[in-house]
Amino acid sequence: MTSRTAMRSHRCGDLRAADVGARVTLCGWVSRRREHGEHLAFLDLRDHSGVVQCVVDGAVDARSEWVVRVTGTVARRPDGTVNAHLATGEVELSECALEVLNAAEPPPFPIDARADEVDENVRLKYRYLDVRRERMQRNLRIRARVNAAIRAAMTEQHFVEVETPLLMPSTPEGAREFLVPSRKEHGAFYALPQSPQLWKQLLMVAGLDRYFQIAKCLRDEDLRADRQYEFTQLDAEMSFVGVEDVLAAISHAVVAAARAATGEDPPPIRRMTWREAMDRYGTDKPDLRFGLELVDATPVFAGTAFKAFASAAAIKAMRVPAATHPEQAASGRAALDRLTERAKQLGAKGLVWLKVGADGALESPVAKFLSDAERAALVAATGAGAGDLLLLVADEWSVACTVLGQLRCDLARPPVHEGPYAYVWVTEFPLFVGVNPATGRPQPGHHPFCHPHPDDLERLEADPLGVRALAYDLVLNGWELGSGSIRIHEPELQRRVFRHLGISDEDADRRFGFFLHPFRYGAPPHGGFAFGIDRLVAILAGEDNIREVIAFPKTQSDRKSTRLNSSHVSESRMPSSA
């Protein structure tokens, strides 16, 4: 489609050498003005497409960020003045007539890359100026391409886009909800959706077969680099499917999104179970861009005389090559003491370290407590060589894994947007994770509607914490993009799971009746997934903070500066029951 409008013939960034001699009209903002002698001035004219140089009469009054309309002739730049850094750098606009469409006050910060160094709260206060910059224009357009690609990918797989309600009953999904008071019923509240989870399952009961939505969700959680009160996700649900069907459909959308953002197909999406991810990487969000995999050293120390290891349920080890973190070797014991303190902060009782000397011998205060066979077996199990550092945590299995997993990231993890893209599906999560200390009941791993793994159903009553779920997460560069599961479609099985959570049949009817009752009318087997578009776009755009890919994000401290956060409401505007 042409960019021509009633006010312009071209966009600023469109002009090329092939346009030389053409008379064109452009509209945009004055990015920079440079005087050239007494009678000429160069204006860099900018719009969302790029920048072009315009040669104007020196008497023309046009300053930074003024909105102007320029009509001129496309000409080649004189020899020696071509700007290879601009797409329009071979040409300029000469014989220009300029019309001022709107004057502007001097901006509070440069509308270019220099604004990256400006305090973020200032950028957010003047977000409408910040978004004029090339970086922000690029990010928002990447986001638009990703959304379009996702819609196309889902539609071609016969998914139907359906909008679900924003006002819904309050349900316990794990995070704090935003509540909206009812005007009709005093003391009653709607909740803004943390996800369309319940609605999309009802759509499967309704026979829609395949649903999707690019949904706005809201959770009253603390803000951080990868979290906002409001976030956008691809939400999808499918009937008559198994795990592989859901993963294939979502993978297709992810590949389409990555291709739209980067122009290239992403690498194949890897697969591993939750147990494997924890064992090898110490986290259910493994970053596969670098090594330092964990090793199970428990068999190495079976029957050991070393008391710290003898009483431990599990012993995990990690080899840190000298080249991976040379400052550890350079700073010696002080750096190792810091690692030990960090391990304790993460919940470990302590950290055992051993260095491999030039002769292959293990050097450590604890080395003398290990037998020759144990030292040799440890070196063999980890593949350690001269100059390497071995870190070991002996504790409960989950503690040993997570502590070493975090140390792994502390030592070697690159920024999330750097390096290759490493996608991985993590499957077979636990149905329940730990026990709620207040109730003594298990806590749901993902949410209460995940279907138990068929192979583990017989263990549901006797060993609920050992039951796997048909649940899965998609992880990119150590960031969880989203999660999903095959859902419980049998009412009685759903009630069994609720009972484990301490939700009685009566309580379930009261809290989830609007959701459970339709399942009595023939709910099909179904499953789905949701992934965060903000996080995906941030990584694909090379950003380490999702605020950089959201037009008007929120921060903890921006209420007074932006006027776009919460505000006080007068008593007269408060809702009252009718």
Enumerate the language-model features and the residues they cover.
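Single conserved hydrophobic/aromatic residue that forms the stacking wall/gate
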Residues: 564-578
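Class II aminoacyl-tRNA synthetase catalytic cores and aaRS-like
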Residues: 1-563, 570
